[in-house]
Amino acid sequence: MQLIRILVTSKPDMTRYRHVEDAYRISLKSLARRYLELHDEISELDIMIAAIVDDLAPDLIKCKAVGYECASQRLITVGDNPERLRSESSFAALCGVSPVPASSGKNQRHRLNRGGDRAANSALHIIAIGRLRTDAKTQEYVARRVGEGHSKLEAIRCLKRYISREIFTLLRNRDRQINSVQITT
């Protein structure tokens, strides 16, 4: 960041743009200025997203390894019409974490669903990896699954489904609270 601030304050000779070194200096100053503008805009938007998530789903942020970006993606996935998601399995299918049978002969296996909202699936993956790094229960769960003969990726697929179930329950309870407040007022 210090280098970027130095580049922004630099004063290249704008009349010597035909020289390669000066053209580089001019471009670097322009890129550094644009970087700082975008950095400031991202910071402002992160603050807005955090405020929105805190208002709409404070319980979601309290979950392990769920940050504001992942929580906001969950809210975007559910949308303004949560009634369309009748069960946690429909939510899992929407997120692309419902199991798809991929059996062959004697092997009974499931693979990850490649459909659904890929951004929601990515957010679930970030949460799963965060929990795998920091949560002892999650580490034990994955170790147990690997001990049962599953690969680590299959164990993570199961973990993503579990997290999806947990988040669906939180969001459904949130919607019930919002609806009960609207009915009473």
Label the model's feature ranges:
Residues M1-T185:
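A detector of single, family-specific signature residues
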